[in-house]
Amino acid sequence: MAREYKIEDYRNFGIMAHIDAGKTTMTERILFYTGKNHKIGETHDGASTMDWMEQEQERGITITSAATTTFWQGRDGKKRRFNIIDTPGHVDFTIEVERSLRVLDGAIALLDANAGVEPQTETVWRQAEKYHVPRMVFVNKMDKIGADFYRSVEMVGSRLGAVALPVQLPIGAENDFVGVVDLIEMKALTWDGTIGAPATVGEIPADMADKAEEYREKLIELAVEIDEAAMEAYLEGTMPTNDELRALIRKGTIEVKFHPILCGTAFKNRGVQPLLDAVVEFLPAPTDVPAIKGIDVKTETETTRESSDEAPLSMLAFKIMNDPFVGSLTFARIYSGKLTKGVSLENTVKGKRERIGRMLQMHSNSREDIDEAFAGDIVALAGLKETTTGDTLCDPLKPVILERMEFPDPVIEIAIEPKTKADQEKMGIALNRLAAEDPSFRVKSDEESGQTIIAGMGELHLDILVDRMKREFKVEANVGAPQVAYRESITRAAEIDYTHKKQSGGSGQFARVKIIFEPHDGDDFIFESKIVGGSVPKEYIPGVQKGIESVMGAGPLAGFPMLGVKATLIDGAYHDVDSSVLAFEIASRAAFREGAQKAGAQLLEPIMKVEVVTPEDYVGDVIGDLNSRRGQISGTEARGIATVVNAMVPLANMFGYVNSLRSMSQGRAQYTMQFDHYEPVPTAVAQEIQKKFA
């Protein structure tokens, strides 16, 4: 089967927004107008097509990006293929947004006309900047009380530091919102609000004529700056034609020089069709964005893969989902080449082969089987065994590793245990499945307590995962409070001379060791033997090292593992009959226990490197709060229109920080933290910890 749509007629885009900007409703309308949906699902009925996980339908928020393919006939009468990725708008799911932005070519940022640019819009916008994604803005909910298009446009500049390019103006607002002025065609488009009705094209209302002229002039001035020839012609008094103007806006949008702004109300069906036309006219096709970079596995040099069916096959797995009917589905974006059912591909990140069995084209939650797919397509693959998010699948003869996605480290850990014996086995399976789907969720076993620890991006993130475990895997679990992993070390040198003797009829046990224990700068354990003259035979020395290592897992203060200890064996004695490796092991164990006490044992805590990105208004509060958490500020710097505060803070004082930061900055600041080093715990705090764990 040959390709049905030319790659130039593809638009791979997503809709990004703050949690309540109406994203799901907008996606529903797009699917309706492009002919895929026959009954529109409303979010507030919990019946929306894109939000297909049960929790999403209950909470009315979008958690999982579902990919959907649909089609739209543009103004020129030509049909285009849209691949739409739905992205979540909640801060605990930013990983999902990062993932989808990574594989998109363009995006529509949705704003609530009443609230304008909200905190999560800033976060997602910054992520899109990082991947250099061309964006348009749609000011939604123009029918809402307090809707203000002009304020929203101003906020795109002041809050996002972006160049706004209105290509429409609203006619009326709140209850009186009826349509828009098209600043390119200089016509009024109005809708009567019935579902699916086309716009009525008419003249611009007299009271808006001057404003429309003023905004069109600004539009042309910004657009011609993109192209020298157009700029020269404009300065000589030649206006661009409407088609030339569209071409200039397209060029500037794709180069991320400015962002076209449109408006409407998805819920009331006003302004949706012009937005779809704008996707065709202003957002890039896969061939309009730079070719994806990667590393050639054979030569280990940088290479690129062009968006072409003729290039070697390369694709990036960007999402894994459990589908109730098909099992595990891997969503992948094909960047180059052609994919056929039944072929065997190389997973270059894992170094494993994968056979492509079943290939699906997804519509929100229905699916169609396909036999082949091409560059630019987004497909769902069933039954891949080894592939996880961020892996590359490619032609085994031309292996490449495409740019890896970067996933933030989890910031919150809690212990989890099955409620009953029956839940025990199921819990392990469920947690491993969830971790395969979500790279920002980690599972580990705590060697010290034997508990299972889960870690994620925030409290809502872990809540939802525990909830999914209950629903999808029928596992009931108890969840504990967040915990810190402390360590112990020593502060000075101590020399210990210890003899182990045991006589119990027949051969006994004898070993004498003389060891110096001292602190060193690293975190590891160093063992050295300075035995000369055979006072401890060579074959017994490994027993000395093994004995010390076996007790370093539990320090003398509160039973935490020990770090940064050096042990030097300087002397000893043995007995021809009674000595053995085991005897030396026992002697060195006892010597270490005595030495750790004498060498000034101390408690260490993990110190986190914290970076807070905040609007300037909240810098003082953020710094004050970090200081109150025993944090040390290492500096501040400007990043765009935000300020970055860097600090070192003990992990023990960072629990619940996401919520304090949210309320302190009205949700506009965000933070990341990662482990940096261990540091001694202040005496007063150490005493409390010892009491608790002793």
UniProtKB/Swiss-Prot annotation:
The organism's place on the tree of life at top rank: Bacteria
SMART domains: EFG_C, EFG_IV
InterPro entries, per database record: EFG_II, EFG_III, EFG_III/V, EFG_IV, EFG_V, EFG_V-like, EFTu-like_2, G_TR_CS
Keywords for this protein: Cytoplasm, Elongation factor, GTP-binding, Nucleotide-binding, Protein biosynthesis
UniProt xrefs under SUPFAM superfamilies: EF-G C-terminal domain-like (SSF54980), P-loop containing nucleoside triphosphate hydrolases (SSF52540), Ribosomal protein S5 domain 2-like (SSF54211), Translation proteins (SSF50447)
Biological process annotations from GO: ribosome disassembly
PANTHER family per the UniProt record, alphabetical: RIBOSOME-RELEASING FACTOR 2, MITOCHONDRIAL (PTHR43261:SF1), TRANSLATION ELONGATION FACTOR G-RELATED (PTHR43261)
Role, per record: Catalyzes the GTP-dependent ribosomal translocation step during translation elongation. During this step, the ribosome changes from the pre-translocational (PRE) to the post-translocational (POST) state as the newly formed A-site-bound peptidyl-tRNA and P-site-bound deacylated tRNA move to the P and E sites, respectively. Catalyzes the coordinated movement of the two tRNA molecules, the mRNA and conformational changes in the ribosome.
Name of the featured protein: Elongation factor G
Species of provenance: Brucella canis (strain ATCC 23365 / NCTC 10854 / RM-666)
Source taxonomy: Bacteria, Pseudomonadati, Pseudomonadota, Alphaproteobacteria, Hyphomicrobiales
